[in-house]
């Protein structure tokens, strides 16, 4: 199953994920704290990964804050065991598992106040 239509819903373990939803990366991923959006969901035989969970395709926004940029560069430098700059970190077409993202519901959450 491939879901691409804006506002189309996909339910997984009692949580609703919709195409176009604003999301934030959780502590379960290298993208923790980054905002983005869902643009595609794949499940079953249409998945690209071998994970037991659906593949949720996200585009993330590059951080503006220099401390956040440095933190992201450090995380990916450690992950790849070589220095990585922001320009070298993939922020679009990132396949995430459901536990790696949280849907952002309110304006306060979008501004990072919750």
Describe the residue ranges of each PLM region.
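Basic/aromatic-rich interaction segments and small domains that mediate binding to polyanionic partners
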Residues: 2-114
